[in-house]
A protein has these predicted regions:
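Glycine-rich anion/phosphate-binding loops
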Residues: 100-117, 156-172, 293-302
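Active-site loop segments of alpha/beta catalytic cores
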Residues: 132, 150-151, 156-262, 281
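A general structural motif
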Residues: 125-129, 181-183, 223-225, 244, ...
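Non-catalytic scaffold segments within catalytic domains of secreted glycoside hydrolases
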Residues: 59-90, 208-220, 224-233, 247, ...
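Short acidic, glycine/proline-rich loop/turn micro-motifs
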Residues: 143-146, 197-200, 288
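Alpha/beta catalytic barrel-like cores
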Residues: 1-151, 273, 301-310, 317
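Catalytic-face loop-and-helix region of soluble metabolic enzyme cores
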Residues: 245-322
């Protein structure tokens, strides 16, 4: 693991983006990021620019058992493929650390290619880190069905091979990002965790922890700080107890749910963890949320956690804004 990763990370209210932007024009999206976040840029994911940039499809090309229908923007499990050959191919690459077969193909990540190119040509002297994202293992495993119509995460053999391919894709992303900035943050997008705890959620907590930690440790081993982004509510104690470096939550709409777990938050912060506060509303944005309103809401939330015994000084030091 690289020495830079072992340093304590105190972002102290630095801001970055979660990842997806609604732009249809990639150049406009890149210009917005470059102008507003020169210290802490992220590469924008642009599903409205091209459906191939949606998080499941973007991560899928070349993974074992899967086929992408580019015309329809769909990912399918191909039950006709030779299981042994599919697994042999991905495990051979994984053991050899060969990431090239798992690079993101051209046309699947214009935002990524554009931001890397921008930093190669015009890297700001104030650059502190470069942030990217990839779909997390739980969300991916619940989004794709196997040949029997089951969530692929429950097909242990196939999913382990698919996850190894996803880990290789993440390695490639990190290595590419590090060519332009040594300090890399990679978020795992996990909207699928919002369903955890309901009667309809089919994955148990031990599987969630095991698969998340496998992914987190893999990317930490590449020298990246790893975050998990969950846009709704989940069992925050489960997520905070993983080996994740950064937990990104919706501080505008779901702070009260996170605040139910003060002991888990304290333990997470004591290990050097960072809370990324999604204080800027997206789906609930009305146009009346001024900077002053957002600051006051953030201060109120800090005070609430301080009343629960969490150091406000530590909260401020370990605060990233999204």
């Amino acid at each position: 693991m690289e020495a830079s990763y072992r340093k304590t990370f105190n972002p102290c209210f630095l801001a970055t983006g979660v990842g997806s932007l609604p732009h249809q024009d990639a150049r406009r999206a890149l210009r917005l990021v470059a102008q507003t976040l020169p210290q802490t840029p992220f590469w924008p994911q642009l599903p409205k620019h091209r459906i191939l940039e949606s998080m499941i499809i973007q991560a899928s090309p070349g993974l074992p058992f899967l086929r992408v229908d580019e015309a329809k923007g769909e990912v399918h499990f191909d039950a006709n493929l030779d299981e042994a050959k599919e697994l042999e191919k991905v495990y051979r690459s994984y053991l050899a650390r060969d990431v090239e077969p798992y690079r993101i193909p051209l046309g699947y990540a214009d935002g990524f290619e554009g931001m890397v190119r921008h930093l190669e040509e015009r890297k700001p002297s104030s650059l502190q880190f470069f942030k990217g994202q990839i779909v997390g293992p739980i969300t991916f495993g619940l989004a794709v069905k196997d040949g029997n119509g089951k969530d692929i995460i429950h097909n242990e053999v196939a999913f382990d091979g698919i996850l190894k391919g996803l880990l290789l894709r993440g390695r490639w992303i990190i290595q590419r990002m590090k060519k332009v900035c040594q300090e890399v943050i990679l978020f795992l997008d996990e909207p699928g965790l919002c369903g955890y705890g309901s009667a309809f959620f089919s994955v148990d907590g031990s599987t969630i922890s095991r698969r998340l930690n496998e992914t987190i440790e893999e990317f930490q081993g590449q020298g990246a700080r790893v975050g998990v982004h969950c846009c709704g509510n989940t069992d925050w104690s489960l997520l905070l107890s993983t080996k994740v470096d950064i937990v990104n939550f919706d501080a505008w709409g779901f702070f009260e749910r996170l605040a139910l777990y003060p002991e888990a938050i304290k333990d997470f912060l004591s290990r050097g963890g960072v809370l990324a506060w999604g204080i800027v509303p997206t789906s609930e944005f009305t146009g009346e949320e001024t900077v002053e309103v957002l600051i006051e809401k953030l201060e109120t939330e800090f005070r609430e956690l301080a009343r629960k015994g969490i150091s406000e000084e530590t909260l401020r030091e370990r605060c990233l804004l999204t």
